[in-house]
């Protein structure tokens, strides 16, 4: 009986990166499809802008931290899922880029540099979409390639 419990605990620990990818996927979907559109509909433009400027950097930072924790867990646990590791590294890079260009996006908006704002905003949207896809791929890869 104790061996079965121990085995289940080991399996749970080895699935930490999988669980983190599920969390990241949920965060991205919730933020992108519920929070941001709702804010733009129910709050005036000025207040929505303030709120979104506050929340987006934290959004990128949370995904960056979770991706880093997942990568660390992968290495620490000695999990031999290299594709998942590479995907996590890409997510980390994408979120670093998004985090650091967010102030530039805000400044472009403030200075009415709409073309620059559009390009950089689109870049963060695309990088976030790629992060979502990578995490979905990690989930699928993990599910179909058990240890």
Regions picked out by a protein language model, each given a short descriptive name:
Residues 4-147:
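Polytopic transmembrane helical bundles with strong interfacial aromatic enrichment
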């Amino acid at each position: 009986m104790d061996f079965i419990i121990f085995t289940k605990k080991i399996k749970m620990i080895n699935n930490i990166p999988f669980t983190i990818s599920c969390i990241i996927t949920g965060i991205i979907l919730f933020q992108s499809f519920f929070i941001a559109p709702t804010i733009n509909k129910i709050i005036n433009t000025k207040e929505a802008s303030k709120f979104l400027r506050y929340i987006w950097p934290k959004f990128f930072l949370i995904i960056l931290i979770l991706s880093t924790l997942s990568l660390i867990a992968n290495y620490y646990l000695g999990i031999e899922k290299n594709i998942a590791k590479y995907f996590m590294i890409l997510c980390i890079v994408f979120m670093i880029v998004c985090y650091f260009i967010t102030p530039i996006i805000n400044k472009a908006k403030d200075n009415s540099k709409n073309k620059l704002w559009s390009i950089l905003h689109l870049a963060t949207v695309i990088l976030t979409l790629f992060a979502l896809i990578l995490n979905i791929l990690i989930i699928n890869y993990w599910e179909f390639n058990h240890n």
